[in-house]
C-alpha cells in the first residue's frame, strides 16, 4: 500500500482555495500529469460527482474513474476510485493566520508493474503532489496579486 501525504500553506481565503481545488475544470491549470479530465455533473460538485481522468504517470497513460465520497465545504474533499488499482485521494483544508493549509493524502494499492516498483512510484507520486500544490499556491497567490495591483 502506498500512502503519501503532503501539505502547503496558500495565502488565500479557505473558501477560495476549496472552490478552486474541488472543481475538476481547474485541474489542467496546475496538474502537469493530467492529459484529460471529465466531471459529471459539471456543477455543483458534491458527494456522487464522478471524475474520469487520463493521466501520464511514469511514462504510462492511465485512465481512472473516481467518485466524490466526502464533501464538506471548506473542510474536506475525498474521492475514491479505480482503474488499474484502487485509489483514495483526500484534501483537507485548515484556516491559518496566513490563509489556508491544504493537506493532500493519497493512498493506492498498486498492481502489476507499479507493485514491483513501489518505492519509485511513491517517490514520483510525492514529487507530483508537491509540485501540484506548489503550482496551485503560485496560481492563486499571483491571481490575487494581479487583482490588487
Predicted regions: what is each one?
Residues 14-15, 42-45, 69-74, 92-101:
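A short, structured loop/turn motif at beta-sheet edges
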Residues 56-62, 110-113:
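Short, cysteine-centered beta-strand-loop-beta hairpins and adjacent loop/turn segments enriched
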Residues 16-21, 27, 51, 68, ...:
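Hydrophobic pocket/interface hotspot
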Residues 1-40, 46, 135-138, 148-149:
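Hydrophobic ligand-binding cavity/cleft-lining segments
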Residues 6-8, 39, 64-69, 88-95, ...:
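Hydrophobic/aromatic beta-strand elements that line small-molecule binding cavities or substrate pockets
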Residues 80-131, 138, 148-149:
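Beta-strand/loop substructures that line and gate deep hydrophobic ligand-binding cavities in soluble
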